Amino acid sequence: MTVTKMSWRPQYRCSKFRNVYGKVASRENCYDCIPITKNVHDNHFCAVNPKFLAIVTETAGGGSFLVIPLQQTGRIEPNYPKVCGHQGTVLDIKWNPFIENIIASCSEDTSVRIWEIPDGGLKRNMSEAVLELYGHSRRVGLIEWHPTAINILFSAGYDYKILIWNLDIGEAVKMIDCHRDVILCMSFNTDGSLLATTCKDKKLRVLEPRSGRVLQETACKTHKVTRVVFLGDMKRLFTTGVSKWNTRQMALWDQEDLSMPVTEEEIDGLSGLLFPFYDADTHMLYLAGKGDGNIRYYEITAEKPYLTYLMEFRSPAPQKGLGVMPKHGLDVSACEIFRFYKLITLKNQIEPISMIVPRRSENYQEDIYPMTSGTEPALRPEEWLRGVNKGPVLMSLKEGYRKENKAIFIAPVKEKKSLVVNGIDLLENVPPRTENELLRMFFRQQEEIRRLKEQLSQRDLLVRQLELELKNLRNSPKDS
């Protein structure tokens, strides 16, 4: 396949999205005084839906994140209640796409936890999860909900494994064990029948998620992939990464032939990771760099030139991560087609950015709001596990978003297991995360071994004394 080198010059074409612009929310509509995490893990540390905004925070000891009602803008008090049940730093959070009060989190403590947030937000710290999932042997860096099947959750750990959890029973039902290094990114196609992953071994893979079978795999020498996203139903993959000259790069792939990219383009020489965001309704692709404040956006087409540059949103404040509002949470009366929630660590602030199509008419714009993925699941967990594939249940945004939340989460009743030694529950103790913690654990174990040896020697001495007394009793003359 011939690789098409794209020109750096913007290619103008007739497009309804040519004049899309970014609009920053006013100061009173931002979220201030939030202690955003300083963790360097390459995640967004932010998740949003039409009811809540969740942000991973910086804490001493354990891990926590804030959950704020979306309308509660302005200054957030330092003692605002947190979700703080993890024993290690929280690395990723994701809202359930079908039950808006349910959020999943993963952490350095090797666990995945499911939380139920009450309507109106938290009134006190929440430390008890409705479900705790243990299966990884090392920290868990990524989680993703299945796009069409309810209560199916994927988690990727630093043990190089992907676990598939059925939350109806609270257990891992499948394991994908084809990666040879840390998994960097996971992305589903529209109906969730395919899973694309990028890995630290520099390979891009397309998998059948139920069996874990690798359908396509590539290690392109000219493009070291870091992030991947499926482009809707176009049978295309989009990746970002770096070239062999360490310049930031993007590439487009045929999902059925990963031997060479369909097209690739170098962006710039900055070092920050490029996060891709794709809107399947408008076929627009957004590129946001970690550590810089700009967001580039393109239009994707099935024919050449495939990627058409539209515009760039510029901002002086660098972003640590970006949350994205689901389509049913947008303001259609303002012709809003995408909304970011930008994490600005320098200001301890979350800044909403709306991408808007300028229109003079105030009527509903059906050409920019087609039927979109809705809030109803297409499949039950057992149906998907049996091999059934279904596309998302579509909804119209014409009447605005008025959801009656019929789906509820019922946590399975699981017997709590424990292994208590010297008053310490070994199953509750997390693996050491640092060299100092490892040394402390080593010295504790050495001290425990020393005590056990002392107890054994004392018992040996007692046994010998009892044996001697028994022998004396046997040898003593019997009373006549």
Swiss-Prot record:
Tree of life domain: Eukaryota
UniProt keyword annotation of Nucleotide-binding present: no
PROSITE patterns: WD_REPEATS_1 (PS00678), WD_REPEATS_2 (PS50082), WD_REPEATS_REGION (PS50294)
Main location, first listed in the record: cytoplasm
Keywords: Actin-binding, Coiled coil, Cytoplasm, Cytoskeleton, Repeat, WD repeat
Keyword Oxidoreductase attached: no
Record-level GO cellular component terms: cytoplasm; cytoskeleton
Subcellular location: Cytoplasm, Cytoskeleton
GO molecular-function terms, A-Z: actin binding
Residues forming coiled coils: 436-475
Family membership noted in the UniProt record: Belongs to the WD repeat coronin family.
Protein name according to UniProt: Coronin-2B
Gene: coro2b
